[in-house]
Swiss-Prot record:
Belongs to the D-glutamate cyclase family. Pfam families: D-Glu_cyclase (PF07286). It comes from the Bacteria. The keyword Iron does not apply. GO terms for molecular function: lyase activity. InterPro entries: D-Glu_cyclase (IPR009906), Putative_hydro-lyase (IPR038021), UPF0317 (IPR016938). Its EC number is 4.2.1.-. PANTHER family: D-GLUTAMATE CYCLASE, MITOCHONDRIAL. This is Putative hydro-lyase RPD_1846. The lineage of its organism: Bacteria, Pseudomonadati, Pseudomonadota, Alphaproteobacteria, Hyphomicrobiales. Keywords: Lyase.
Amino acid sequence: MTVFPAGQQFQTEGECLPSYQVRLACRAGQADTTAGVAPGFVQGNLAILPEKYAAAFHRFCQLNPKPCPIIGMSDVGNPQIPALGLDLDIRTDLPRYRVWRDGELIEEPTDVMAHWRDDLVAFVVGCSFSFEEALLADDIPIRHIERKVRVPMYRTNIACTPAGPFAGPMVVSMRPLKPADAIRAVQITSRFPSVHGAPVHIGLPQSIGIADIANPDYGDPVPIAPDELPVFWACGVTPQAVIAAAKVPFAITHAPGLMLVTDLKNKHLAVL
């Protein structure tokens, strides 16, 4: 039985955690958007890079903890990250991947077995899906879950702090909320800094460079009612944007909205 530093224990394979069931479904090609699945378990964004670029990317994440909070990292060439889950294989356990060459998206496979190399390092970055459980528990509605679509995500004019070849704008996710719910959401998500924490912006999307909120750069659009405000959180798709801008010769990421579901518990991420 594996124990990770917070003291949480993973169940044995026979007991089959809901998170492990999701990963098995991914291996079988039967999974899609992970919003709302395996309640209680931490989800993560994925970035896989050659070892040559790993140190600079790690530094980028350290300098930009809001969009890029690292929750796990593999050894060089090892597709498993035991601290994140039982029998977890980073090559097969997400619903869909993106493969990049020289900054260009070339493929979106359901596994990356054929692309795996001995020099690759995998980074798992915290995902806002993890704090959504806490919002729902406080009766704060989440539009993309209600509509069973991917959360809308946007590139902004908020610059990230550069590191090595990695630089570019922050990507944000958006959830429309009534003002009272937005205030409560700030309070709730502030407790979860390892999965983006409090919002980075509320209202006035044009002021952070979003020209048309009805057309997200990633994910799916959701309606905003007249009595609602768009609330924006730093997003773990930011690494995809900076990896593409850096034109790294080879990289693998998750497809936006289709995350790695780990065996870590959301409740263990709260700082208060």
